[in-house]
Amino acid sequence: MRIISGKFGGRRIVVPKNLPIRPTTNLAKESIFNIITNKSDLKNLKIADTFSGSGLIGLEFISRGSDVIFVEKNIKCFKHIVKTLKLLGLNNKVFKSDVFKYLQTSDQKFDYIFADPPYKFSYEQYLQLIKLIVNKNLKSDGLLIIEHFKKNDFSDISEFKERRDYGDCSFSFFK
């Protein structure tokens, strides 16, 4: 996997095969970041990369000038993110925590929150996550982006704004 643009653009990040993740493809990541950068300049924005997995989405935001925190429960993923940040000479905060617990107790507000929960999440879990983030953790002009399996449809949720599909992977945007 690689970082697409910015300070670390073109840099390859080795993701161990034993991590319990499904990394976002470079094509999907590039497409999503084209959408995001058309909406705003990412420099100095506060970003939360939740259910971080490999940390590649957060690293892409960092490379483009954003201030990013990572929230990941899995110890192997957590250690990988910490190691990768160290290799890049970065000191961003990485929280080893359940995402719901972190968000419920955090008083931080973010410009963007990226969430890539397990595909086995139920509709109710997605709904709980969306409501929590939009009502508590996003700035008033902030945006929540959820990566999910294509079969999931969130268009009936009032905070839903748009959806983009890339193969079996979809991204839904909420405000």
State each model region's role:
Residues 1-175:
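Class I S-adenosyl-L-methionine-dependent methyltransferase catalytic core
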